[in-house]
Amino acid sequence: MARYTDASCRLCRREGEKLFLKGERCYTDKCSVARRPYAPGQHGQGRKKMSEYGIQLREKAKVRRFYGVLEGQFSKYFEVASRRKGITGENLLQILETRLDNVVYRLGLGTSRPESRQLVTHGHFTVNGKRVNIPSYLIKVGDVIAVADNSKNSPKVKSIREIAGGKVIPKWLEFDEENLVGKVVALPAREDIDLPIKEHLIVELYSK
């Protein structure tokens, strides 16, 4: 399976803002963006002004990196979003938010999206009682996401609960912290997505 191989902190510095790829570290003074707020590389501090097209490309790259989605899959998501009723950019974000790995992260069961993706791949979660190990699996309203019974006592899950416990859960999700069970009660609205994304730039890019 294709995946990003570049260092997470370099990706954040390249985009010029935190992508929250390193979990707890992103909230401390160890964050690379806070310490070196410029692009990586020899000429990182002398970044030139970008064209309109370049700005649109960077916004798409930023969103892909937020959610850990590669180019081909992102293009497919956009095609689906453009066919749905409503605003294409908001439809796109809604699709990305309802990926299983992102829902796991939003429930506080992973300290970052990359970690949540890894936990899903390792089979630590069930959807409606069936084990699902596909991070891109799209969750629907009414779906129940739970930590698999044989994973509840694993050291990894226990440590995550200690770090992520008390996380604010989006209003489109419900979470039973005692039993480690979450439920999708609605599709996320634009105001529920707290990421610094300008989705209209992506729509403009694909419209060319």
Curated annotation (Swiss-Prot):
A GO cellular component entry from the record: small ribosomal subunit
Keyword Ribosomal protein: yes
Keyword rRNA-binding attributed: yes
Disulfide bonds: none
Residues that span the membrane, as ranges: none
Protein name as catalogued: Small ribosomal subunit protein uS4
One GO term of the biological process aspect: ribosomal small subunit biogenesis
Subunit field text: Part of the 30S ribosomal subunit. Contacts protein S5. The interaction surface between S4 and S5 is involved in control of translational fidelity.
S4 RNA-binding domain span: 98-164
Family: Belongs to the universal ribosomal protein uS4 family.
Coiled-coil annotated spans: none
Top-rank taxon: Bacteria
UniProt GO molecular function: rRNA binding; structural constituent of ribosome
Keyword terms: Ribonucleoprotein, Ribosomal protein, RNA-binding, rRNA-binding
InterPro entries given in the database record: Ribosomal_uS4, Ribosomal_uS4_bac-type, Ribosomal_uS4_CS, Ribosomal_uS4_N, S4_RNA-bd, S4_RNA-bd_sf
Role: One of the primary rRNA binding proteins, it binds directly to 16S rRNA where it nucleates assembly of the body of the 30S subunit.
